[in-house]
Amino acid sequence: MSRIGKKAVEIPSGVTAAIDGGQLSVKGPKGTLAMSLSDNIKYEVGDGSISVQPANDSREARAFWGMQRTLVQNLVTGVTEGFTKVLEITGVGYRANAQGKNLKLQLGYSHDVDFAVPDGIEIKTPDNTTIEISGIDKQQVGQVAAEIRRWRKPEPYKGKGIKYRGEYIFRKEGKKK
């Protein structure tokens, strides 16, 4: 029995949800998001809420129940508030600069790294060591953050690299003489 799946997803005012075909589409002040529906789950759009129930009592349906409810919640949160991830750059000479739909990274390579920002994502650099990634699709925001971080993951000796805000970097002691 899913404790998460039991709760209905509340739809705030200004947000509309509709099921058409095999898609659930949610429209709000920040935009429109859609997701394909699972055959193992029953979705019901009522007044002010979306409820998610397993279609049958199979193990797979019960396993998907809580996850599908959370995906629906992420759609509603995305079109109302949006999602943000913050990356921090540590290291001498490491910096970032957002220029329109392009992010220029200087990460200690012999060349600058140019990252093309996908549609639906907004990137800001409040200072040259902080990158703010925001958008309405939680999966896409996380994917873009992971792709940027992949260029220079934090190393365990000095902690140089790109890390998520709040991420703990396991540090190692250097060689002893």
UniProtKB/Swiss-Prot annotation:
One Pfam family named in its UniProt record: Ribosomal_L6
Provide this UniProt record's keywords sorted from A to Z: Ribonucleoprotein, Ribosomal protein, RNA-binding, rRNA-binding
Q: Which one GO biological process term can you cite for this protein? A: cytoplasmic translation
GO terms for cellular component: cytosolic large ribosomal subunit
**Is the keyword Ribosomal protein assigned to this protein?**
yes
GO molecular-function term, one example from the UniProt record? structural constituent of ribosome
| Keyword RNA-binding on entry | yes
Which PROSITE patterns does the record associate with it?
RIBOSOMAL_L6_1
How does this polypeptide assemble, per the annotation? Part of the 50S ribosomal subunit.
UniProt similarity note = Belongs to the universal ribosomal protein uL6 family.
What is the documented function of this protein? This protein binds to the 23S rRNA, and is important in its secondary structure. It is located near the subunit interface in the base of the L7/L12 stalk, and near the tRNA binding site of the peptidyltransferase center.
NCBIfam families (alphabetical): L6_bact
Protein name in the entry:
Large ribosomal subunit protein uL6
